[in-house]
Amino acid sequence: MASKGREGEHPSVTLFRQYLRIRTVQPEPDYGAAVAFLEERARQLGLGCQKVEVVPGHVVTVLTWPGTNPTLSSILLNSHTDVVPVFKEHWSHDPFEGFKDADGYIYGRGAQDMKCVSIQYLEAVRRLKVEGHHFPRTIHMTFVPDEEVGGHQGMELFVKRPEFQALRAGFALDEGLASPTDAFTVFYSERSPWWLRVTSTGKPGHGSRFIEDTAAEKLHKVINSILAFREKEKQRLQSNQLKPGAVTSVNLTMLEGGVAYNVVPATMSACFDFRVAPDVDLKAFEEQLQSWCQAAGEGVTFEFVQKWMETQVTSTDDSDPWWAAFSGVFKDMKLALELEICPASTDARYIRAAGVPALGFSPMNHTPVLLHDHDERLHEAVFLRGVDIYTQLLSALASVPALPSES
């Protein structure tokens, strides 16, 4: 336990470890403890604090540092408070202890995804306020629930509420991903999650007979069509040295059907997780799914469990004032950026769909990707470097001059 209370530990690291100890783990996150923690941070930093309960027990906490020119749109810094479940037996240390080893690695669920970023936002604001800075644009920090289970009772609802509109967000930052290289990963868009169930109906009967037109035979044809598409996209990814977010992925995740070994089922189903690349014509792709089902035979249908249609791409053109401010910080700090499409889904998709350009960025280079993994961890030096980077980013973004639409 020597890692606790170590003399000389940076206060930002201590705060980070404290936040990691709050058990906001799905499926029963302690959101109340997280909100209380954030309220105390607001009190200490002299920030405005608003709590918006989007559904009972699911609170979006908004901390606000007012700018000097309220006519300008604001900067939105978003992070989620929940974390994914753990298999404690596979961890070297308690995932909710906030343990720091002798080498400076901080272990905990949320160390990379994304409690580190939440504290980096807060500590960057604290540093700027202590130094006496004031900026034209207001900075809002939103801490939202439910992201790890889709954001359906979090950001998806929040962006539809008047409290979100009142923030008048002009530009947003959300989570990114660790990078094992020298470059920092920046997400400017993300793939659309399509979860669907294919259901096949056919003739039932005794398991000893060669029955024609069975549900299994027809479902097999659809599965083959989809997995052939998967292989094609996999080859495109590998042969063209693309990033995962640039192609469409699909995985067969569930198979259901049957009641007994000797009964041919009348119905069988297969579930698929598609992540559709931003450049895909979504209407045409849905028609392709329909054609695969029709080609399999009569009685084959599909239904969506999740279907995201609001694909948005945030500008990374040098003429864009937000991107110019963001990328300019990295040029000044002589840090490399690597632009990517997020291969998974984050709350940034809801923000972009609400008309607010957003980038996904977590300042973790030279760091293995360990989100959702056993022994999720982050080195304290990388974490503190991230506070430095956010300090510069907030200063630049909150100082972007009035846009033509704001004049």
UniProtKB/Swiss-Prot annotation:
The record's free-text note on cofactor binding: Binds 2 Zn(2+) ions per subunit.
Enzyme Commission designation: 3.5.1.14
Active site: 82, 147
Coiled coil regions, renumbered to chain: none
UniProt-annotated location(s): Cytoplasm
Superkingdom in the source lineage: Eukaryota
Cofactor(s) required for function per UniProt: Zn(2+)
Pfam families: M20_dimer (PF07687), Peptidase_M20 (PF01546)
Any single GO BP term: amino acid metabolic process
Subunit relationships: Homodimer. Interacts with SPHK1.
Protein name (database record): Aminoacylase-1
Source organism per UniProt: Sus scrofa
Gene: ACY1
